[in-house]
Amino acid sequence: TGSMLSTYFIPSTGTNFIERQELGSAANITFSDIPQTYDHLELSVYARSDVSGDVRQYGVYFNGDTTISNYERQTFYATNATVAAYQYSSPVPGIIPGATSTANVFGAQTIIIQNYVLTDRHKSTLILGGYTTRAEIQLSSGRWKNTAAITSIELIVDSPDEFEAGTIVELRGIHSTAPAAASDVAALNSIAPADIEAVN
């Protein structure tokens, strides 16, 4: 009694797939000529390094800018029961397993790049990621100290590393608003006030 279930329709025009890269061999990843028709971008990263080590790092660079001091990051993270935070100049969104980490384990991050086409402000990112064999999760915010619209994104693992084969990175565009189809509007208009009162 008193339980409620709500359902929502999310139009396919709200989030649009731009490009997917799945590596067949070790490499770094670049997205070029990014469309300037969205409000925000989302990177979905499923990655592992090809160099020995339990933990490796990679950077996310915009418009070919690889100057470390042009990026800032604030991170809150938890490893097992230990919680900590730090801030420093870095384009690194998180950690991924190295080649000697547990076999078949990949790290995962979701990176939101907000207002990437606006040219009157620095670019901000929100990052959530981690991987289970290290029992670590990270939540970060980042800033690129540049007002230029973002037209390219590079994901580069710390030298001499590259991403291992099987790494998958997807880029999507996000619209702040999405037009409703005429059929959806008609369906909404067909709801009788009495039915709404009954639900309430």
Q: Where are these predicted regions, by residue range?
A:
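Surface-exposed molecular-recognition determinants
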Residues: T1-N200
